[in-house]
Amino acid sequence: MTAVFVLHSADGTTDPSAFRKQAFGECDPFARHREIAWEGPDAMAAGRIRFVGEFDVARYPHIETLIVVEGELTLEAAGAAPLVLGPGEGAVIGVGTALRVAAESRVLVMFCAAACTKPTKRGLFALRADADFKPSASLPAEVLLGAAPQCRSDNVFIDDGAGYCAGAWDSTPYHRIVRPHRVNEFMLLLAGSVRFAAPDGSVLSLGAGDALFVPRGAPIGWESSERVAKFYVVQNVTVSTERE
């Protein structure tokens, strides 16, 4: 299946050839540590970061969601208490945020970043598996193969300047047809498992601890038989996000 980019497999089978070492923009604070699996025309990228050490950033240059899968990462925004992230925890950093980043030993982090020349939100925002879930819209009947699911979400961060939204989401089981994905979407599964189907009939099965990226327009289906929870980032690419 080529529609989905697997960024991390909890069972340790992640393909290292799927990544290339590359900075995200000219002022990337993780330039020496970043490995990109997907970068699109809408100034968004997804992949992983392997990091140990510390640094300070006076003004974070882009929007970035970071989710730890191995080790411990400390993020400290100016004037705020340190945010210590372990496996299965994450945070979103807004453009312009003054930040200290530290890891005493090597940490493996999934990322989804987006450039934004006209940001609307600054700061550091925690992502938690025990999110403040609220009922959210279900799927239209015409794309479902069975009963409509009950969905909940907690939108932790929204920046209208990049069409970027990050948070947590969960749902009861459902089965959806293969259709073009309507947004760029990063996911890290927190609970449950999903069978992602391609038009050729192939299926990719992913579960808790796995991370993936689905580009806008990629044809993909969804089938789950249990509650699924995930951290997510979505980008509405109708918003212009070109770098200056």
Predicted regions, residues:
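Ordered, small/hydrophobic-rich secondary-structure cores
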Residues: 1-91
